Amino acid sequence: MNKEKPIAALFDFDGVVVDTEPQYTLFWDEKGKKYHPEIPNFGHHIKGQTLIQIYKQFFREPEGLQDEITRQLLDYELTMHFEYIDGVVDFMKELREKGVKLAIVTSSNDAKMANAYREHPELKTMVDFIVTADRVTHSKPHPECFLLGAEILGVEKDNCIVFEDSFHGIEAGNRAGMKVIGLATTNSAEAIAAKCALVIPDFTDFTFEKMKGVLQ
């Protein structure tokens, strides 16, 4: 960490800023039971993957199936609620006050994020930039999204800290050469601890000073 240069905090969205993972798990569990009954807990199995990755691995056939699932998913997302993870709003406010640059770096596309903005229009002003799947070529676990976030914010990777909950996201942060703080919201603390500099249950009582301690 270079103490003379700015710090950036890069937040994944689902499972880090908002608690949507249980809702997505229900949706994908239903699809798994219908199309892949041989895979138990299908919703958990595909966590952290983009829609393109899910389609490529599990829904190549029959023709038209991907379009049908996309329509169903868009309809489902219109009914979803985007509840903030405990403590994240206050934590982001504190980081802003301390001069930390903030970005949301998500595997979600622009259409999905538009649904979140309808419920939380303040999201766009809580951070300096939002990197979605529509702005990158490679999905997590490729580090492109986090490297792009750092570039847009003008912060060196050594001064960036990533907040992630999924295995793919944690791997992407590590491959970007950044410190990763894991959120034990989607996976257990034990499951992600080895790949994270620190694991927290949520942002309750988490502070700028604690975050800075991870960077040093």
Role assignments for model-derived ranges:
Residues N2-H44:
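Active-site neighborhood of HAD-like aspartate-dependent phosphohydrolases
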Residues K33-E38, G64, E97, P121-M126, ...:
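Short helix-capping segments at alpha-helix termini
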Residues K56-M92, K98:
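Metal-dependent phosphoesterase signature
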Residues K31-G32, Q49-E63, A116, A150:
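Helix-loop "lid/cap" segments that line or gate small-molecule binding pockets
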Residues V16, T106-S108:
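Conserved phosphate-coupling serine/threonine residues in phosphotransfer and NTP-handling enzymes
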Residues K98-V100, M178:
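Short phosphate-binding/catalytic loops that engage adenosine nucleotides
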Residues M1-I7, K93, N109-D110, N115-Q216:
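Asp-based, Mg2+/Mn2+-dependent phosphohydrolase catalytic module
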Residues L78-E83, S107, A176-G177:
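Short, flexible loop segments at the rims of nucleotide/cofactor-binding pockets, characterized by
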